[in-house]
């Protein structure tokens, strides 16, 4: 019999009554965590060494701290407005950041908020290196006695939905049972903010041992602020968009590269003439690129795409709304086989239209606008979106391989990496000193699937350089002391300078392909290192494309389309006000211009000597319209100068 409670303290007491000794708790990644319940449980045991707590989870999300100086003036009001003052910060994350978890509390994560825990010994030491598809088995091996999860309630009904996280809860229960272990207690916290998703994400309330429903409004869901998309991002997204085949399957990751790709696909479909003009300006030879001709296309989507991605995010909203994603699939193997054979009849077509789904994911995470879109979906559209287990989404070997091969035709798996070697290895999740930036997540799964499916391609996207000016360094490296994707799985890489197709190529060919998408400043050194390592024989002159592969040439090529709005700063919408959108580039410029003592002093002197009065609205937003102290006046001058510099760009 499922218990129903409305009080956090009573829920914690109920759990502790039923579990003797150590608590071994599983919780979903991302927004599926019941923050309030986890905080209450942590608060109860933090000072009780007799009650050890082990938490198995990933991607524990807390809003950023405001920082100091100008950054705090910007971030403080934004964080309050965007996340809400009542957002329940995860206490264990704040403790980990200080390495302040007590000895009897351990948090194991297989994926971390990107870069957020690089300086935490506790987080780094207890990181677990796992493919997303292996997480359920790893949790089961630890014999969890409690799983907690946030759920949505069915409007006008009695069922509950795993909604944002149908990823590993059911897989974990199956793995626990396979080991002959007792089923853990399952506790759900109902969140009124969480969108209802039916289908395989829906369960009866009896699936849980206890359902907690706290009265009153729920805090906002954690919302990712939508970030500005740069010309570099757009170039990468535009190149990537040419590798997508109509009628195919699409997986995309997260971040501004994915945002740029989503916008480029929408532009290709809704304004093909402009799309082709942008591509012509970016690279006049792109349409004849062998990879584009063999694997992609430039035409609008007559059939549409099927979205199959571990994470559903902002880009998918845009792709669904614009009609790019609309190719439906069905879980009936016979029907899918007949569609593939061309023998489907009118009844099959009607059933596909009525029962099929065009978008599958395992979890979702996005902005408040994305969650509002999910909540407001027309029922018929909502029924075409299915939240599935990660064992279904991220691999072919979950028991339905024949079906999934038919559904995932012409699959394109787009993911980001930080660096790539000239021989085709990718660095996506960690540093060469062993520290983890994030985690492999599903990236390996998708790369492997691209090699397992016919006509599928894995595309890893990266910016050609990091930092700028004299501090610029190439992200196309000869080698690096950490690897996420090994070179024997090399496929396609994209930077802002083009497409490198490495699949089945020799090492020399791979080096030349990667040099072709490297920043011009670093091509010579890269090719020289390759020669020293005996990976090059004679290098043709055309291998170096120094004139084209520069930031200045790229900005010049895309500038007209940035100005006319074809490539907007915020293609998926913005969570920042117009004033904040002017402030962001100014603050970014100022941070770069004050890195190092000499640069900081020079920038300060120029700012103090500048006669610019600044942007009144921006100064008001930063509470610097009427500076009250010497420090305030210096900050106001620096900000006004930075606004002047970025206004001129």
Residue ranges and their predicted role:
Residues 1-649:
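Conserved alpha/beta enzyme-core scaffold
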């Amino acid at each position: 019999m499922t218990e129903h409670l409305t009080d956090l303290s009573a829920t914690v007491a109920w759990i502790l009554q039923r579990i003797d000794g150590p608590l071994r708790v599983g919780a979903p990644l991302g927004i599926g965590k019941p923050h309030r319940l986890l905080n209450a449980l942590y608060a109860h045991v933090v000072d009780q060494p007799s009650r050890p707590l082990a938490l198995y989870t990933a991607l524990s999300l807390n809003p950023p701290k405001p920082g100091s100086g100008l950054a705090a003036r910007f971030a403080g009001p934004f964080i309050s407005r965007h996340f809400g003052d009542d957002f329940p910060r995860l206490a264990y994350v704040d403790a980990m950041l200080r390495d302040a978890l007590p000895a009897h509390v351990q948090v194991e994560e297989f994926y971390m908020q990107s870069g957020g825990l690089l300086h935490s010994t506790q987080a780094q030491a207890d990181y677990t290196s796992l493919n997303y598809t292996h997480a359920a088995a790893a949790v089961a091996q630890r014999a969890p006695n409690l799983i907690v999860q946030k759920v949505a309630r069915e409007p006008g009904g009695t069922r509950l939905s795993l909604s944002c996280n149908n990823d590993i809860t059911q897989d974990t229960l199956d793995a626990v049972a396979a080991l002959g272990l007792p089923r853990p207690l399952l506790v759900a916290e109902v969140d009124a903010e969480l969108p209802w998703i039916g289908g395989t994400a829906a369960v009866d309330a009896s699936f849980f041992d206890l359902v907690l429903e706290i009265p009153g409004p729920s805090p906002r869901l954690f919302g990712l602020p939508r970030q500005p998309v740069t010309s570099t991002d757009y170039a990468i997204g535009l190149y990537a968009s040419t590798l997508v085949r109509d009628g195919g399957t699409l997986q995309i990751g997260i971040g501004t590269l994915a945002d740029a790709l989503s916008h480029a696909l929408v532009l290709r479909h809704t304004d093909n003439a402009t799309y082709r003009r942008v591509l012509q300006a970016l690279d006049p030879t792109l349409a004849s690129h062998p990879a584009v001709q063999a694997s992609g296309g430039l035409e609008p989507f007559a059939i549409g795409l099927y979205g199959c991605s571990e994470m559903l995010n902002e880009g998918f909203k845009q792709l669904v709304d614009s009609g790019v994603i609309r190719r439906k699939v069905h879980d009936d193997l016979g029907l899918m086989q007949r569609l593939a054979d061309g023998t489907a009849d009118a009844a099959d077509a009607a059933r596909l239209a009525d029962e099929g789904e065009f978008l599958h994911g395992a979890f979702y995470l996005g902005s408040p606008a994305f969650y509002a879109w999910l909540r407001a979906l027309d029922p018929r559209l909502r029924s075409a979106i299915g939240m599935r287990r990660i064992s279904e989404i991220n691999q072919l070997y979950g028991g339905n391989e024949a079906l999934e091969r038919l559904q995932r035709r012409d699959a394109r798996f787009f993911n980001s990496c930080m660096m790539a070697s000239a021989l085709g290895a990718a660095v996506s999740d960690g540093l060469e000193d062993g520290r983890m930036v994030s985690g492999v997540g599903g990236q390996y799964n998708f790369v492997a699937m691209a090699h397992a499916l016919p006509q599928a391609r894995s595309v890893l996207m990266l910016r050609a350089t990091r930092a700028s000016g004299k501090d610029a360094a190439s992200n196309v490296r000869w080698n690096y002391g950490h690897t996420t994707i090994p070179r024997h799985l090399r496929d396609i890489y994209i930077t802002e300078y083009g497409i490198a197709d490495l699949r089945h190529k020799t090492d020399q060919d791979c080096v030349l392909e990667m040099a072709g998408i490297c920043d011009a400043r670093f091509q010579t050194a890269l090719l020289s290192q390759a020669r020293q390592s005996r990976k090059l024989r004679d290098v043709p002159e055309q291998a170096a494309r120094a004139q084209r592969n520069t930031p200045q040439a790229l900005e010049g090529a895309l500038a007209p389309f940035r100005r006319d709005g074809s490539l907007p700063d915020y293609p998926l919408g913005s969570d920042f006000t117009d004033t904040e959108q002017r402030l962001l580039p100014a603050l970014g410029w100022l941070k770069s211009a004050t890195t190092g003592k000499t640069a900081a002093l020079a920038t300060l002197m120029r700012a103090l000597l500048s006669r610019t009065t600044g942007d009144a609205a921006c100064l008001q937003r930063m509470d610097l319209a009427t500076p009250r102290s010497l420090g305030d006046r210096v900050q106001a001058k620096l900000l006004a100068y930075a606004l002047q510099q970025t206004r001129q760009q």
